[in-house]
Amino acid sequence: LIKQPVVGTTHVEMPRNEVLEQHLTSHGAQIAGGGAAGDYFKSPTSARTLIPLTASCLRPDGVFQLGGGSRSSFNPLQTDFAFHALPSRPRHGGIGSRQFVEEFVPAVYLNPYSGPPDSYPDQFIRHYNVYSNSVSGYS
């Protein structure tokens, strides 16, 4: 049995852009998560390490990438078109864990339940439409 040293968590404070966040939220975009914000480090002995970011790490047009190491394949014009092509109607269910489950449906769950669509959990419906809160093929 080999013991490895415990590596502490590194926290990075990201600069906030309220205008961009409001634009993304209004158009239904959400970065995974959605938990309540708060300071979880209550112990006076726990050290909080912050890494300053340079201005060049985040592009001023709001295009960013999570994970990976390659450059973004979108230019600002394509990104703007993508945002404006999204429906303007609000999504059903709000933003949070329910919307996350609705948008990232596991492909292995096709239709494991039988019965009318109202009896299915939303995350298991193959043709569930989050905009109209309906299932295609059912009236």
Swiss-Prot record:
Coiled-coil ranges per UniProt: none
Keyword Protein biosynthesis in record: no
Keyword Ribosomal protein: no
Induction comment: Expressed in the late phase of the viral replicative cycle.
Positions of the record's site feature: Cleavage: G34, G35
Keywords: Capsid protein, Host nucleus, Late protein, Virion
Subunit structure: Interacts with the peripentonal hexons as well as the hexons in the facets. Part of a complex composed of the core-capsid bridging protein, the endosome lysis protein VI and the hexon-linking protein VIII; these interactions bridge the virus core to the capsid.
Protein name: Pre-hexon-linking protein VIII
Species name: Bovine adenovirus B serotype 3 (BAdV-3)
Upper lineage: Viruses, Varidnaviria, Bamfordvirae, Preplasmiviricota, Tectiliviricetes
